């Protein structure tokens, strides 16, 4: 099957890279990414639409006055391979911080709100409470919670509307190094944009 071929290509790439045969290493890396690109069916226009939807959502949301929350939340956003795991590890080394990892809740909530016809403060409050209930299932004892879903950068307006006191850490890295690191590592289908060099 295609995924076996993809993993084989990435493995052969790594073997060639280890013996410094970079020409053959890149050949297999490129093939693995091409096969993965077929599986992801990634279309840039779909991301453009999601980003525009989130911009429109924020324009709607910022007009609505809502209550805040007392839960301390830290959202770690950015590109994959930008140092976000290290940032979260450093934060959770503190006894009052719980690392939630990569949680898809915010993007799911954004999509739900985008699909809502009626929009008011109670709706925002409901979704805020839904998110807090979901993370409470993961950990309710730590006073600070981190959410490291990197692609939440698309939803920063929503995050700050739901949680005005939230902290956002945007992880960045030198762009060429970041893109190369992304390209040469296998990523799940949800990050389909990573397979085009």
Tell me the role of every PLM-derived stretch.
Residues 97-100, 105-118, 141-197:
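PAPS-dependent sulfotransferase catalytic domain
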Residues 1-138:
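Alpha-helical solenoid repeat scaffolds of the TPR/TPR-like class and their adjacent stem/linker regions
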């Amino acid at each position: 099957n295609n995924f076996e071929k993809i993993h084989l290509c990435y493995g052969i790439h790594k073997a060639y890279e280890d013996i410094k045969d970079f020409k053959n290493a890149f050949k297999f890396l490129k093939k693995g990414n091409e096969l993965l690109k077929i599986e992801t069916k990634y279309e840039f226009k779909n991301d453009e639409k999601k980003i525009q939807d989130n911009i429109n959502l924020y324009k709607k949301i910022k007009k609505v006055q809502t209550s805040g929350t007392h839960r301390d939340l830290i959202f770690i956003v950015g590109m994959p391979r930008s140092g976000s795991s290290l940032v979260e590890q450093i934060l959770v080394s503190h006894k009052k911080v719980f690392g939630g990892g990569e949680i898809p809740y915010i993007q799911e909530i954004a999509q739900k709100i985008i699909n809502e016809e009626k929009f008011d403060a109670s709706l925002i409050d409901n979704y805020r409470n839904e998110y807090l209930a979901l993370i409470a299932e993961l950990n309710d004892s730590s006073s600070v919670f981190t959410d490291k879903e990197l692609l939440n950068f698309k939803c920063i307006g929503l995050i700050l509307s739901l949680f005005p006191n939230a902290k956002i850490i945007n992880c960045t890295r030198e762009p060429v190094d970041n893109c190369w690191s992304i390209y040469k590592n296998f990523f799940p289908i949800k990050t389909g944009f990573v397979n085009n060099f």
